[in-house]
Amino acid sequence: MGSALLLALGLLAQSLGLSWAVPEPKPSTLYPWRRASAPGRVRRAWVIPPISVSENHKRLPYPLVQIKSDKQQLGSVIYSIQGPGVDEEPRNVFSIDKFTGRVYLNATLDREKTDRFRLRAFALDLGGSTLEDPTDLEIVVVDQNDNRPAFLQDVFRGRILEGAIPGTFVTRAEATDADDPETDNAALRFSILEQGSPEFFSIDEHTGEIRTVQVGLDREVVAVYNLTLQVADMSGDGLTATASAIISIDDINDNAPEFTKDEFFMEAAEAVSGVDVGRLEVEDKDLPGSPNWVARFTILEGDPDGQFKIYTDPKTNEGVLSVVKPLDYESREQYELRVSVQNEAPLQAAAPRARRGQTRVSVWVQDTNEAPVFPENPLRTSIAEGAPPGTSVATFSARDPDTEQLQRISYSKDYDPEDWLQVDGATGRIQTQRVLSPASPFLKDGWYRAIILALDNAIPPSTATGTLSIEILEVNDHAPALALPPSGSLCSEPDQGPGLLLGATDEDLPPHGAPFHFQLNPRVPDLGRNWSVSQINVSHARLRLRHQVSEGLHRLSLLLQDSGEPPQQREQTLNVTVCRCGSDGTCLPGAAALRGGGVGVSLGALVIVLASTVVLLVLILLAALRTRFRGHSRGKSLLHGLQEDLRDNILNYDEQGGGEEDQDAYDINQLRHPVEPRATSRSLGRPPLRRDAPFSYVPQPHRVLPTSPSDIANFISDGLEAADSDPSVPPYDTALIYDYEGDGSVAGTLSSILSSLGDEDQDYDYLRDWGPRFARLADMYGHQ
């Protein structure tokens, strides 16, 4: 360059020991700033190496370096610096003397925040013109060991199986140091300060890995190990920090379960199941609740019928002996069981064998009162339909399992819905006590079910329940009959028409019903000569003519027989009308009339029809009379003045004397047959005012008249209620003002029965002839 900066690194602090030398020029890096001091020679500016300064410097301000320019004399150059630490954040860390070029440190440095600063230096003349090109000034912060190492966790956790071999990895401890990792200030070393005795674990000082160093880890001895860890910088000679490591020992099945006794004694009641009779205690040193601890029990011998089982109590790990099949004291009084115990998890091969891996269990059976037992339950038997009372059904006896107690058994009924059976209380013999109806609702598919009880005489007694199922055998007690109607018609020509189809029914069930056999009565020889019956199927036959017979009604005697054992036979009369037929095989119209008159309606049938007609007419008449009587009674209850009560020469009059202003009465026909109200000459159709109503009275709205006689009572009740609730009418308990009606009265005063216009000894004995309703009057006024 034309002119070079003469950088004088005036070491104000002798401790740094820095000396600056002008490097020899190198042609390969020559810049075109020349200064002709000699032919063929160029001078270059100083190359300034990084300036190092320690962090945490206490003496401030502290001189770092001095820069100078050789272009002008001292005092004619102004120096300045720019960059981070000067006019950029962090500000005011560095400053420069503008006349001397000395650079000062003004604040304490922290390498962990900023490890170097890059500044720009400027040289100007007094007029502010640039004398030299700007040059770079780099300041490097030298690290000090001012940060302790730190573990990433306060507590490190690891797990390892007991019995692990040496060198087994457990966990890894990790730590950091904020100092310069390129220096010993961040060179960390790990160690174990404390772990107890014996020492089963070691830590790699460089990586922090924790591993086992010897055998002998036993969870049953020590389940958890607590280690104190340390990390130090300066390769172990500097600052330190500590943390903890918790190592849990996982369980393996290295301990076999053992019984606490060589023999257990228990008692069990007979004839019960699903009950616990005792517990088998075991010990296991492995982790409670784990598969290495949970016990499983096996009955090796002594229970060939599988009457016992052993399950494990999950809380106590005890074996619970339970009875799954009822025991019988009379069959066996004692059981000797041999039981073994193992864990759910298999035992480790290196584990020692248990001394009490098996035990004996003695179970004594207690004798109890057992209920009687029916050898055959349910008991099925059969009896003929319609069996008479006293017919033996079965003997439903039970036996007592308690052979040593010599108990007596009694029998009774528990369920016999038809009360059909009778049970001998001592023997259990069952017989009928009446005839069972075939239509009983308790017969299901021909079976009748009853429940019998057997009771011993123990205290308290025991009861057994037995079911008796009785099949009611069908008996052929009904003969077949022709299906209705037992009549029909045939063409007079034998070859005409399809014939007459005959059907039969039977109230008996199979096999006492169909097939049915149809036969003309052999006792009437003429039937076989003129008529024939051919079987169609098991329940129907066809009747035909062999020869032409006279037209009209013919009565044929038929024999019907079923297939029961023994068979039942019925003789039945068949009414057959023979008529002339057309080409289609049906009776001609004239013949049909003849046939209709002789279908075979008997005199009894005609009487029934006529009687039914008469009964129907009588019922209709009674219904009409009852309707009229009810209407008349209803009218009497509402309008007492309309009754016409005639008692010989005594008449009932409604005359109440003269002087009444209101001469208009209700028309009952209008009540029974209301019509629409017609408009009158009164304005707005208002009704006439009552004479006893105040002048401010406002008539009530028109009420709708009843539409049927049955509503008359409601109509009158509504009118009474309207009058009672009328606020414009004075109340009944106040004095009313009536218009003057004049003196005297056309009608005289009412006289008593004793006051007579004739002689005083009038005879009232005729009142006795009027019936019980006048008996009281006859006693009062008749001759004594």
From Swiss-Prot:
Source organism superkingdom: Eukaryota
InterPro entries: Cadherin, Cadherin-like_dom, Cadherin-like_sf, Cadherin_CS, Cadherin_Y-type_LIR, Catenin-bd_sf
Transmembrane segments: 606-625
Topology feature Cytoplasmic, residues: 626-784
Pfam family, one: Cadherin
PROSITE patterns for the chain: CADHERIN_1, CADHERIN_2
Expression sites (tissue/organ): Skeletal muscle.
A GO BP annotation: homophilic cell adhesion via plasma membrane adhesion molecules
Membrane topology: Single-pass type I membrane protein
Predominant cellular place of this UniProt entry's protein: membrane
Keyword Calcium recorded: yes
Protein name: Cadherin-15
Organism the protein comes from: Mus musculus
Lineage, broadest ranks: Eukaryota, Metazoa, Chordata, Craniata, Vertebrata
Gene encoding the protein: Cdh15
